[in-house]
Design a protein with these regions (language model features):
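Membrane-interface helix-loop junctions in multi-pass transporters/channels
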Residues: 1-130
Length: 130
């Protein structure tokens, strides 16, 4: 049960950090280049990979603390870090599967975003809900 609370607390910390970074990079208008998201995703990718592959955290760090750092803080801070870690892990074993996963992740994400956008626009125009 302790691990669930640690991950939850990490989630609060990670999402709060992401929000603070978005405030630091807010341009005052939308759309603008997503600098905050880029900063969060790139730093999260670095941090997750660093934490999981560093010998101390990999072999000696308490599993509850490791879960709080990775799943909690980094997981709520960004999901891109998880994607990049999985791509690296797949590349070590099966480059073809890594390419398929990467393409599915990118184009699947774009497709879901497009469908969400179109659905929201349709609802906003009264096409589904009146």
């Amino acid at each position: 049960m302790k691990i669930y609370f640690a991950v939850g607390l990490g989630g609060v910390i990670g999402s709060s950090l992401r929000y603070l970074i978005s405030l630091l990079f807010w341009s005052g208008s939308f759309p603008s280049f997503p600098t905050a998201t880029l900063v969060v995703n790139l730093s999260g990718a670095f941090l997750l990979t660093f934490i999981l592959f560093h010998p101390y955290t990999k072999f000696k760090l308490n599993p509850t603390i490791r879960a709080a750092l990775t799943t909690g803080i980094i997981g709520s801070y960004t999901t891109f870090s998880t994607i990049t870690l999985e791509v690296i892990m797949l590349a070590r074993e099966n480059i073809s599967l890594m390419i398929v996963y990467l393409l599915m992740t990118i184009f699947g994400g774009l497709l879901c975003s497009f469908v969400g956008y179109k659905t929201a626009r349709k609802i906003a125009k009264g096409g589904i809900v009146k």
